[in-house]
């Protein structure tokens, strides 16, 4: 199959979210005068990940996620805060984090050289994702960036991809490839939209989900070999 349009997930696929989050949380919590920063992080990460999973499943809204995650975590430590205000303050710190995985820039450079049309398809907050890309070395490789908050829908809902198709001239699902690390968002989303997928699985996780990737890779070089 000759693919023309490559849709890349960002976090954990090209952008090193874990590294960026570590820096941003430390800066944010220091500014908030949190004493035991590590204890806060240990509770925050699973809570935050769980809320994003709930969003994928349609159990909560993006607004609920953004407005309540910090009020919930601070409440866990006996401190009452305005969740929305904390979210806005945290955005300032996380938005500066454009760390990428080693080789991500060279991957996109080579794919661009080969003539592929490259797009970003990400679940996230518009301000955060746009600013993280601005602080990264890979922004220039994307013809367009599709962010769930702007789209009014998110992966894995088929409507997310249908809206992308409407905005790309000549887009055909059978000539497009969704590339990402998340089985429940990226691969299931591609399945729902009827397009081929690449599961980026550098840690060799077992697929216990219902999502069925067309291809599975563990390195960027494998993607280049595939294409």
Predicted feature locations:
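Asp-based, Mg2+/Mn2+-dependent phosphohydrolase catalytic module
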Residues: 1-6, 19, 30, 109-112, ...
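N-terminal helical cap/lid subdomain that shapes the substrate entry/recognition surface
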Residues: 1-102
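Short glycine/serine/threonine/alanine-rich loop segments
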Residues: 79, 116, 195
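Catalytic-core regions built around general acid/base machinery
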Residues: 103-115
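Conserved serine/cysteine hydrolase catalytic core
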Residues: 119
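Conserved phosphate-coupling serine/threonine residues in phosphotransfer and NTP-handling enzymes
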Residues: 122
């Amino acid at each position: 199959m000759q693919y023309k349009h490559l849709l890349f997930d960002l976090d954990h696929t090209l952008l090193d979210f874990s590294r960026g989050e570590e820096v941003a949380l430390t800066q944010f919590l220091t500014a908030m005068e949190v004493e035991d920063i590590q204890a806060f992080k240990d509770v925050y990460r699973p809570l935050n990940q769980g809320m994003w999973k709930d969003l994928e499943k349609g159990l909560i809204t993006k607004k609920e996620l953004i407005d309540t995650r910090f009020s919930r975590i601070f409440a866990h430590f006996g401190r009452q805060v305005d969740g929305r205000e904390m979210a806005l303050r945290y955005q300032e710190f996380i938005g500066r984090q454009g760390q990428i995985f080693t080789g991500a820039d060279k991957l996109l450079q080579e794919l661009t050289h080969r003539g592929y049309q490259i797009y970003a398809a990400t679940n996230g907050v518009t301000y955060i994702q746009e600013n993280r890309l601005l602080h990264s070395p890979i922004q220039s490789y994307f013809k367009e960036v599709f962010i769930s908050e702007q789209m009014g829908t998110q992966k894995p809902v088929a409507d997310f991809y249908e809206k992308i198709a409407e905005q790309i001239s000549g887009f055909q699902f059978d000539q497009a490839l969704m590339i990402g690390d998340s089985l429940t968002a990226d691969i299931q989303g591609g399945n729902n939209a009827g397009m081929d997928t690449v599961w980026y699985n550098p840690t060799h996780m077992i697929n216990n989900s219902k999502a069925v990737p067309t291809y599975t890779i563990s390195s960027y070089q494998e993607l280049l070999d595939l294409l």
